[in-house]
């Protein structure tokens, strides 16, 4: 944009200079004094004029010359004023000291006439093209007309090369992408096996989980060209531009094959066609159609691998997700506790941390945080430390940053009455006591009555470990914990406030999900009741969200939700009445301390004593021999490849062992059969036929009396040692 503005400014300055020179040449550089007709006649009559020149021009006579004081002057005489013109001419001729001339009308040159006509047209055309190119995002200069050119940027792997070891908390996702790296490095072994590498890989996951970073790591490991573009860069105000940019993108990719094309937020262009409001957008549909053809159409895109990222796979067009286009979908989820610790090490490598900082403990306190959330957490902690003039980031800074990220900045200057503080303290104490009693699912980490964001206070409840499933008792405990604040207000003040609205919203949502989604209602049974539209209106889906159950079922669902909430309300009330002493003690302590951490809460609840927490006394022993100290935060390409080769070798060893065991067993059976056959022949040679048959039966109970057992109604088994064809 700045370059385009400079170009326009230079052109404008050049135009002004040319116009000024042209005006100077035509006007000889002098600006004469303009006289009215009466002033001119008066000076002529007085004899004040030294020279006089009359020249016809268009509809007037131009009068110019010099006065006796050597001042330039000019005036005009209208064409229809012939009488005055004749009078002025006679008067000028009669004056002896006056140099009088009459010139013929000068015809304007063709060049000047064309220039005068074309300059406004050229200026308007230039401004039109410039603003049009700006609307298209093409910039100025030589890119003005490049509407259909791709906006993809080619990433240079040599400047900021990202490796698999730089990506933390996504080891399984890297294992899924390892074949892409191998194919870009050397595709001979895949061709020998007749394999077809996936043409496209769709990275699906919540925002901030590292989908773009994984794509860059694939390009960095393979050393291949990496084209990066956003899905919104294809669709513009003109129809056909998006399809043209798709064609140009693949043409550039073919010139640099093998390479990677990465489309971020592909749902902007890959939304399902003709669905919902805005679904029938012609430009987007044309762009998507061109993308589908380029990925898997009549043309061959050998060596081009598409990687796309989205957090809304449900709205993508089915044609985009079929095999041959995006063959593989990789779920990039939020990291577990080990992944969060590795990510914290990645983002803390350029930050001075105090000895009190325990990144493992922080990872345990941040369940559900994505990589972007953890980076923001440490950045907030560094800003807090810098604001307070510290040289290092300590654990208190990280605790404060965690509270800011979860609940917002503290509103310590907010004026709150004593009554409101008392209500908030008992409200949060109710949550805390329920959390201490029902700690199967979650435990209390911190409780505060300092206002943050929209909340007057909050209790931080953390799960004991990362959870992927929740049982019915755990969900009921969660509802009970959410109701603890309102029940505590009711018990202590016999009146309720508006502070529990968010608690009710969350509790009701959990109860409704238990009934309609999880099948946890004994009355309605293990059924799922959902709307046909998926429960939400989105521009890529139909807006109709009609329920697929009757009004009577809807009434029963509401009754079941009410029953669950009422039962947990009464259960919560009984728990708080049984622990009323602890409830009042925690509320009283909150009014004086304002914030309590887990260690203090446990001591108050079990011992009735408030301990002092010394953050500076904690020292974390760091393992200098760990991979983090060597700058390795995740499994590298070599580590993953070595693990896969080792797994392959282990499978081969197990298969070989199985084959050896089977061969050994077959040889044993064959030897036993030969021994039995030899004994049978000896007995038959030394006795008559009847005795032979009798003795044969005594040696082999399964012998039928035939030299070869008949193979009647028995399927052929190649491993059967009793089958003569296998001997």
Curated annotation (Swiss-Prot):
Keyword Nucleotide-binding tagged: yes
Superkingdom assignment: Bacteria
Low complexity bias: start-end ranges: 710-727
Cofactor (UniProt): Zn(2+)
Cofactor binding annotation: Binds 1 zinc ion per subunit.
Name by which UniProt lists this protein: ATP-dependent zinc metalloprotease FtsH
EC number: 3.4.24.-
GO cellular component: plasma membrane
Gene Ontology MF term list: ATP binding; ATP hydrolysis activity; ATP-dependent peptidase activity; metalloendopeptidase activity; zinc ion binding
Residues annotated as transmembrane: 7-27, 111-131
Membrane-side (Cytoplasmic) residue stretches: 1-6, 132-727
Its biological purpose: Acts as a processive, ATP-dependent zinc metallopeptidase for both cytoplasmic and membrane proteins. Plays a role in the quality control of integral membrane proteins.
Annotated family: In the central section; belongs to the AAA ATPase family.
Compartment list: Cell membrane
Binding residue positions for ATP: 205-212
Residues on Extracellular side: 28-110
UniProt key word Metal-binding: yes
Record-listed Zn(2+) binding positions: 427, 431, 503
Stretches the record annotates as Disordered: 645-727
Basic and acidic residues bias spans: 645-684, 691-706
Assembly notes: Homohexamer.
PROSITE patterns membership: AAA
